[in-house]
A protein has these predicted regions:
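Interhelical loop/hinge segments that connect adjacent transmembrane helices in multipass membrane
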Residues: 1-18, 208-249
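Residue-level signal for short hydrophobic patches within transmembrane helices
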Residues: 11-30, 57, 61-64, 140, ...
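Membrane-embedded alpha-helical segments of multi-pass transporters/permeases
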Residues: 37, 107-112, 176, 180, ...
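Small-residue-rich hydrophobic transmembrane alpha-helices
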Residues: 48-108, 145-164, 253, 257
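Alpha-helical transmembrane segments of multi-pass membrane proteins
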Residues: 125-148
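Membrane-interface helix-loop junctions in multi-pass transport and translocation proteins
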Residues: 172-205
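Single conserved hydrophobic/aromatic residue that forms the stacking wall/gate
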Residues: 255-267
Length: 267
């Protein structure tokens, strides 16, 4: 069922409209927990440590995605409410393209410097291979991760919050299934967990792309031009959400970095 974001809401209807987004956020926050459970169960503590060490790279990507998603959806929603539908769709298409381009740049940079990144994030030589393997395979799905973050907000803007919720739930279940399949059944190493996460991200990314390309609803892809003002406003609007996710990356980095005591005892 479709709901227009420009409709008049009662407190009850507003809660019903917002509830799928709330559940989506809860489900996405469980992704790392699922990966951690399967990695520790089938690969051991060293593999789990490696996944935690390189995860700030994923947090960085997620922070940028959420910044564009929340900030961009605010800009697009405002224009839809003002009746500027063509401008809203141009901004949506432009911001999606910018987000994907940034994710591709991050992917290329990580693939080129994965070893240095793993060491910078605190990897020891003992688990460096684990860190590099998880990081490389995880970052290959960076565009899908970016699109999942963007579509999560833009499905709500398009009046399809339930579709976004269904895709997020399916993605989470697929992540758990393929974690088990790759690690327990196929006997893969840590790259299996990264691929499972990537497959989960691909589901909402692919379905969302098909939807916004071919279903001409309230929001869909259209030809666009560069809009510097839209980009600036979206980054400003979404900066608080980006900082929150960057804080998670910094906390994770501080927990996994070697302490001065560790450095002194290793000499």
């Amino acid at each position: 069922m479709s709901q227009s974001i420009s409709q008049k809401f009662t407190p009850i209807s507003l809660l019903k409209f917002a509830l799928p987004s709330m559940v989506m956020m809860m489900f996405m926050s469980c992704y790392t927990i699922v990966d951690g459970i399967f990695i520790s169960r089938y690969l051991g503590s060293e593999a789990l440590s490696a996944a935690n060490i390189v995860y700030p790279v994923f947090n960085l990507l997620l922070a940028v995605g959420i910044m564009f998603a929340t900030g961009g959806s605010a800009v697009v929603s405002k224009k839809l409410g003002e009746g500027k539908k063509e401008e809203a769709m141009e901004d949506f298409s432009f911001l999606t393209a910018v987000g994907v381009a940034l994710s591709v740049l991050l992917m290329i940079a990580t693939l080129l410097f994965h070893n240095q990144i793993s060491l910078f994030l605190g990897s020891s030589e003992r688990i460096l291979d684990y860190c590099n393997a998880y990081l490389i395979y995880l970052v290959l799905f960076a565009p899908a991760c970016m699109l999942q973050s963007l579509y999560q907000s833009f499905f709500v803007t398009a009046g399809k919050p339930r579709l976004g919720l269904v895709l997020t739930v399916i993605a989470g279940l697929a992540n758990a299934f393929f974690d088990y399949f790759f690690l327990a059944v196929c006997g893969m190493e840590i790259e299996g967990a990264a691929i499972a996460t990537g497959i989960g991200q691909m589901i909402p990314a692919v379905v969302g792309t098909v939807y916004f390309f071919f279903f001409k609803g309230e929001l869909h892809f259209v030809p666009f031009h560069f809009h510097g003002a839209t980009l600036k406003q979206s980054c400003f609007n979404g900066s608080s959400e980006m900082v929150s996710n960057l804080a998670n990356a910094i906390i994770c980095l501080l927990y996994t970095s070697p302490s001065p005591r560790d450095l002194s005892t290793s000499r």
